[in-house]
Amino acid sequence: MSLDEAARQLKMAVHDAQVAFDCVGLGDLDRAQEHAVTARAAVDAAEVALARAQQDMSPEEAQAAGERAVVALEDA
């Protein structure tokens, strides 16, 4: 996995956590739980990608790849 994937998963986790939070406020607990589980899965996937990147990349490579990943998501 790449830092692109880690960034994408983290962005998805933030979205799903926000939806879960909003659903709690609406009293839709089934949907809140569904999105909380999805957020957790995305965070877990991001953690795996980040751990792999730590093993495979130098700090300089990680900085460059991380910047590209974030810019790509912001442009999407």
What is each stretch, according to the model?
Residues 1-76:
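C-terminal-biased regions
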